[in-house]
Amino acid sequence: MKYPLVFKDLHIEDYERVIEVTCEEVQLHAVIAIHQTLVGPALGGVRAFSYDSFDDALTDVLRLSKGMTYKAVLSGTGTGGGKSVIILPKGMTRPTEDILRAFGQAVDSLNGQYIAAEDMGVSVSDINIINQETPWVCGIESVSGDPSIYTAHGVFLCIKETAEQLWGSSSLKGRKIGIQGLGSVGRKLLHSLFFAGAELYVSDTNQAVLDEVTKFYGVTVVPVNAFPTLECDIFVPCAFGGVINRSNVYNLRCRAVVGAANNQLENPSLGAVLHAQGILYAPDYLANAGGLLNVALAVGKAYCPKTVLQKVSQLPLILKEIYQQSENTDQDTVILSDSIVEEKLTAYI
């Protein structure tokens, strides 16, 4: 079935292309943001969420797509940066098959400029449905599978590197670690941290998930609003972005922030505030790059899990270099990581 799609180009400065896509017939309302394709096709996840307003959705997709550029360049995927959001109608918690198929046709119309993958609110099985309408997807079950496994592993390795920087040992035994959000990545990360001997404090809005992890991992459940100011060794944000903001940044009681969430800082300038307080911050687009590496290394080539694992294992080495530069120059890690990316991008201009 061919869906009657309506396209509207939104002219946004510093973005190659931003397109609003609608199809009233199936209630599709989406935005595809292509930040840059200098390095390769714009690769990024599809997020489905019931936003309060279109402006909220646009702000989210613009920040996320730019973050994908930085994530791709710093981790060396050979891809560009893009992202998309499906704005779910009020009361809808998951995209319907028609919405996914219509969205797939929208992606297909871009002829490979944007390659879609799973993200919050969109499962691997949803990507399989989108794949029925376009070949421009990655992370499907028959090829590279669920990328959250590699996202969680990359964050875990970066947490261990952060422990090494803080205490001279990568051991997490007895370390108090707070995980905010137990979605597909957060739960896998919790599993690794449990077996590493960490003392775990968790929050989530899903009571069933909390009951399950309490039973099987013996975690301590804290209220959602306990983060990010909960006293702990390492705070691990794995839910929405902007969790660290002007109203709470001076009240953090952790030694480090290392998480899977995108855009953890409401504003990049808060990196300097964390640095001034002696709080180590692992740039989010580096720590959570494992999932992107998993799907990107299947684009245009045969998928090899050992190659993916090797690339993900390099993330803490990059983080170590950034931490050391931060200590040597007294600059915050956000400025340093951004400057590394921007320097690499100039080589393509």
Model-derived features with residue positions:
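N-terminal ligand-binding/catalytic initiation module
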Residues: 1-142
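Flexible, glycine/charged-enriched surface loops at secondary-structure junctions
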Residues: 72-77, 113-118, 167-175, 326-338
